[in-house]
């Protein structure tokens, strides 16, 4: 049985200037800043955009770009088994409290997707 996708969790955007991006997304777009972003070792911010989130990440080097969208899932282990059965390459990130369990995969065009099982 195929694992379930619960919905879009967040869209992650690489930006050169986090404060400038925050002004746009908060002042112009009406998003609200979240206070629960873990320390990932690089500048960024998490925003609420209705029931979904926008994650801003400071990466000036396009080669290190982490732009992606994240699908919320209920069972990350089932997705790993699903990918293994289909020989789909993926990367499972170490668990970061507050960030949920994460698996990254690329579509055939090279777009990065994150599957995210939130901490509850």
Where are these regions (language model features)?
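A short linear hydrophobic-aromatic micro-motif
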Residues: 32-35, 56, 89-93
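N-terminal beta-strand motif that seeds the catalytic metal site of vicinal oxygen chelate
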Residues: 1-19, 67-69
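Core segments of cupin and vicinal oxygen chelate
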Residues: 12-52
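Short amphipathic alpha-helices in soluble, non-transmembrane regions
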Residues: 27, 82-86
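Short acidic/glycine-enriched loop/turn segments that link adjacent beta-strands
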Residues: 39-43, 63-65, 97-101
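Mid-chain, well-packed structural core segment of small domains
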Residues: 69-83
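Vicinal oxygen chelate
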Residues: 1-4, 85-120
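Short acidic/polar mixed-charge low-complexity motifs
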Residues: 52-53, 111
């Amino acid at each position: 049985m195929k694992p379930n996708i619960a919905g879009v969790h967040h869209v992650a955007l690489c930006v050169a200037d986090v404060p400038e991006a925050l002004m746009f997304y908060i002042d112009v777009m009406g998003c609200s800043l979240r206070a629960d972003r873990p320390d990932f070792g690089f500048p960024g911010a998490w925003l609420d955009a209705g029931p979904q989130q926008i994650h801003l990440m400071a990466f000036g080097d396009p080669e290190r770009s982490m732009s992606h969208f994240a699908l919320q899932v209920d069972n990350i282990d089932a997705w790993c088994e699903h990918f293994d059965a289909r020989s789909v390459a993926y990367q499972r990130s170490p668990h970061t409290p507050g960030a949920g369990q994460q698996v990254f995969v690329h579509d055939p065009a090279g777009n990065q997707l994150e599957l995210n099982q939130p901490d509850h």
